[in-house]
Amino acid sequence: MKALWAVLVVTLLAGCLAEGEPELEPEVTDRLAWQSGQPWELALGRFWDYLRWVQTLSDQVQEELQSSQVTQELTVLMEDTMTELKAYKKELEEQLGPMAEETRARLAKEVQAAQSRLGADMEDLRNRLGQYRNEVQTMLGQSTEELRARLSTHLRKLRKRLMRDAEDLQKRLAVYKAGAREGAERGVGAIRERLGPLVEQGRQRTANLGAGAGKPLQDRAQALGARIRGRLEEVGNQARDRLEEVREQMEEVRAKVEEQAQQMRLQAEIFQARLKGWFEPLVEDMQRQWANLVEKIQASVAANPIPPSSVPQESQ
């Protein structure tokens, strides 16, 4: 029980610090800074720009959110991004050339995982907007301010996750591209080796034997390092996501507490008004009865004056 209270206190302090010093947003307001002109990056940039417009929650956005227009636009942009991404990945696979099978499989697996995370982020965004539309439709004639605030918080969180996963995918594709370039260079080296003189071929074969002995170790070391880095990044991402969830839950709890307090104040005011309405007529009636009684007493005294008492005189 003490441990639970300690965790709650730490969470509250973290929320207070977050309110006192707001977290700085990454510089992503104009364009994605890491874009290098690849078609899939340009398609993702269009998705990002549309998301920035949706996040303003302007009157036009609110109007279009009532229909399926926003989710349809996001679906088209998602499909364009995934199509361009698959085409770019296929192009890199064709350029890989000769490469260790373990390295090829590892790179392909990492890129596929990063691609899946990016697609899941886009899908979560679309689903969240669809959920908001359904919630608004069920609250016709009521205030949707709380729904808009909650949507803004979720969009900010999803946008950060989308940015992080997009950068991770770009980095892994860069490694994939470097592997393709290395494979092409190895292919040219192999042709040069076959066309060289016999002495050069023998010397090259000897050098390749030495390199071949160390290559599996190098590949395994690279694979192990990549797995360790991936695991550390995953743990860090999970910790950040968990912290965001805790903060979001605390914000929701605080909003509910404030709402309940406001309702209690309103109920107290209503009860006070009812009490006043009950007792005011009673007090006024008692005052009227008391005034009538006083008037009657005064009238009775005026009509029947008390005669002066006779005092007997003493005999002299």
Curated annotation (Swiss-Prot):
UniProt KW keywords: Chylomicron, Endosome, Extracellular matrix, Glycoprotein, HDL, Heparin-binding, Lipid transport, Lipid-binding, Oxidation, Phosphoprotein, Repeat, Secreted, Signal, Transport, VLDL
UniProt signal peptide: 1-18
Origin: domain of life: Eukaryota
Compartment(s): Secreted; Secreted, Extracellular space; Secreted, Extracellular space, Extracellular matrix; Extracellular vesicle
Keyword check for Secreted: yes
Cross-referenced Pfam families: Apolipoprotein
PTM entry text: APOE exists as multiple glycosylated and sialylated glycoforms within cells and in plasma. The extent of glycosylation and sialylation are tissue and context specific.
Residue numbers spanned by region LDL and other lipoprotein receptors binding: 154-164
Keyword Transcription regulation included in the entry's annotation: no
Subunit note: Homotetramer. May interact with ABCA1; functionally associated with ABCA1 in the biogenesis of HDLs. May interact with APP/A4 amyloid-beta peptide; the interaction is extremely stable in vitro but its physiological significance is unclear. May interact with MAPT. May interact with MAP2. In the cerebrospinal fluid, interacts with secreted SORL1. Interacts with PMEL; this allows the loading of PMEL luminal fragment on ILVs to induce fibril nucleation.
Descriptive protein name: Apolipoprotein E
